[in-house]
Amino acid sequence: DREAAKIIASLYRTELVEADGNPDMVQVLSPYRVNTEAGVHALNKQLREIANPASVKAEQWNAGSWTFRIGDKVMQTKNVDNISNGDIGRVVQISRKKDGNRQMQVDFGDEKRMYQEEDLEDLEFAYATSVHKSQGAEYPVVILPVLKCFYPMLRRDIYYTGITRAKTRVHLVGSKSALAIAISRTNIGMRNTMLAERIRAEAKRQEYVPQTKAA
């Protein structure tokens, strides 16, 4: 998974340049959140430094294990006020209140929310997100790891969901053998549909399938 993570970062950098630096145009999806370098948490650390590197001029907020910067792409992780679990926004302001404590404003498009320090646990970076969290969303470009170390999550429905989030192109990072496993496996009790054929068709449409030793 380490080699796959490197390839994902390289693809992300290339696609970000093509998107004029707009991270909303490129989304990395992973079936796993933790316990792998190709999971959501580990990938976010890499991708954030590509999309929004530290700058001496840019305001940032060190809060525990998190460091937020102006321009960061973040996701709300629970329902609150008019912001829903899974909503993605951008950090637009980091400031200090009169009492000296910091606060941070996130723009979600239709809504803006001001976060205090105790609210930050409701946020996580969103350069990479889980396939599950991506349901109902669409992105011009999707990058999706498909590795044998993901075996419990190598399922037809999961990868069909991930692949079909892409409006323009999708990059599958891993191996064709891992993809074959995903196509052959489905949820217990899931109806017999045309998902296998559709996922093969979507995979054929992709621009590039890099092979990795991690697969």
What are these regions (language model features)?
Residues 87-215:
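C-terminal accessory regions
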